[in-house]
Amino acid sequence: MDDSTDDDSYHPRKHYAYDRQVSSSRWRTSREYIRGPGPETHTTESAQDGQDPPAGVYSYGYFSGSGNDPQVQGHFVPEIQKYNPYVIFKGEQLPVPIWELPEEKVQDFHDRYFIAKDKSRVEARKTLNRLLEGNINTIERGHGYKFNIPKYTDNMEFNEEVKVSLAKAGKTISRSFCNANQREVASRTGYTIDLIERTLGAGLNISKRTVLYTNKDLFGDQSKSDQAINDICALTNIRRGSLGIIAAEKGIVVGNIFLELTNGKSISCSIGVQIPHRLDQIKDVCVEIGSRNIEYILVVEKHTMLNYLLEMDYHTNNNCIILTGCGMPTLQTRDFLRFLKQRTGLPVFGLCDPDPEGISILATYARGSCNSAYDNFNISVPSICWVGLSSSDMIKLNLSETNYSRLSREDKTMLKNLWQDDLSDVWKRRIEEMISFDKKASFEAIHSLGFDYFATNLLPDMINKVREGYVQVQEKKEPQDTEASED
């Protein structure tokens, strides 16, 4: 599954937060950098005004007051750099964060795989013009468009270094107007290239839904216009956002943080806000003044989960950021999660229903999807840990049989396909348990034990169990020095 089902008609409940002007003088006197979970501060010349800390090394927050003895208001507690058995990948070799790869290594990935890049609108438009101009001769001869598009949906491999599924370079598929079987798809591709080029030239963005309705007779339905957009991203090696294509964003983020924008304003996330379309307009992510340390990011499968946790004030009581894609996440939601992970260094935990679709959604955040294979490198978060809910979690609760439904044939096929991947032992075991249990459920069934039970008891316990996974591996990997203990 992927994000191709984005629909502009979908409107989840929106929590609008206020914009406020952040005083530049307050920002200059209060911004400091923190290393690790302790209160150690760094005020060296390398942490000058407006300069971001090195990615993956520092976390940062707000302090009240000024001078040499600031009071900590709260900061981001970075993830322990140890393997956790609840991640999706097998083996204890940690993935190298994409943003920490040296430039020559990134180039090596681009040579070996089809990976889309961020480009300026001017560069993107020039690339599209070259594609159109390259077809002028064939069009004049009456042959129409012809494009050789990289194969990405069925030409993927799992890269062990970054723990992400990527599309291998070297294979292409033809879209030719001369071929009767390819004529329609070639026409859709050529039309969409021209549409995007004109939109970029006008300095505008266009939604995926609008692309469909600019020529409904040509596309027919959303899946075909989405395919044309994805093909163009692969053909040009340009990311969708750089082409001015936006989807109806349904993702929401909640937490005692605010997003500092490049225009000097900020957006509070304390009561929930829709995920911004343009990450390039976010300058920083900061802890709200007066808030405690933020300890982790919790990704939840669906809108009802987020509404429930928001009602229980879970993000404040448990010092976390909550994010949902309201089902299968869009590219923007996945990119925003990667952005939060990169900027904060926080561990990421995933919560889903005990059903095949929930597992597939978490796997998409971690590894990516086939339809976005050209962008998986940029937006995947392989370190996400599957907190629950699993079949064994539900069995232990002794819920009534009326809370379950049988797995369908499609459910079993999805589980078997997931199981065949090279997954960690925990993921494999949980999938096997679900197949054996032959039932699925929804987290709402747990409310029969009390409305607040899940938020105040079960979920914190499950997260603590996953967090202990780091410690267990650490003790296993680093036994105590016997000579030192004798001293």
UniProtKB/Swiss-Prot annotation:
A GO molecular function held by the record: Tat protein binding
For this UniProt entry, what's an example GO CC term? Answer: nuclear chromosome
Q: Where is this region: Disordered?
A: 1-56
The EC number(s) attached to this protein equal 5.6.2.2
Partners and quaternary state?
Homodimer. Interacts with TOP6B.
Q: Which UniProt keywords apply?
A: DNA-binding, Hydrolase, Isomerase, Magnesium, Metal-binding, Nucleus, Topoisomerase
Miscellaneous comment text of the record: Plants silencing TPO6A1 are sterile due to defect in male meiosis.
Q: Whose protein is this, by species?
A: Oryza sativa subsp. japonica (Rice)
Q: Which reaction does it catalyse?
A: ATP-dependent breakage, passage and rejoining of double-stranded DNA
Instruction: Give the family, as the similarity comment puts it.
Output: Belongs to the TOP6A family.
Q: Which residues bind Mg(2+)?
A: E301, D353
Q: Which cofactor does it need?
A: Mg(2+)
Q: State the protein's name.
A: Meiotic recombination protein SPO11-4
**What is the purpose of this protein?**
Required for meiotic recombination. Mediates DNA cleavage that forms the double-strand breaks (DSB) that initiate meiotic recombination. Possesses double-stranded DNA cleavage activity in vitro.
> Biological process GO terms, please?
DNA topological change; double-strand break repair; meiotic DNA double-strand break formation; meiotic DNA double-strand break processing; reciprocal meiotic recombination
For this UniProt entry, what is the primary localization, expressed as one broad class? nucleus
Q: Which residues form the Topo IIA-type catalytic domain?
A: 119-252
Quote any Pfam family the record assigns. Answer: TP6A_N
Positions annotated as active site in the UniProt record: Y213
Q: Which cysteines are joined by disulfide bonds?
A: none
Localization per Swiss-Prot or TrEMBL: Nucleus
